[in-house]
Amino acid sequence: MSNTTLKMSQQEIIYELKYAWSRQKSVSIRFLQNSQETTSQGKIFGIDYDLLYIKEENLVRRIALDDILSINI
């Protein structure tokens, strides 16, 4: 088995982000950070051009939209 990471299409990611943000639902986002796969959980705080802001308890994390691999609501 190869060591490849499956990625949602950009269109699917944007649709899921907008849905979760409009309804203030908690999300789990899988993304690349320094070439490592990372998971973040929280509520979407905002979207600005090519960045996503997600609030995790008392921390706001900034994630580039191009680095997002998948999102689960």
Would you name each region that the model predicts?
Residues 1-39, 57, 62, 69-73:
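Short glycine-rich, low-complexity segments
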Residues 37-40, 47-49:
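Short beta-strand-initiation
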Residues 47-52, 73:
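Short, conserved beta-turn/loop elements at beta-strand boundaries and strand-helix junctions
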Residues 52-53, 62-64:
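Generic alpha-helical hydrophobic packing signal
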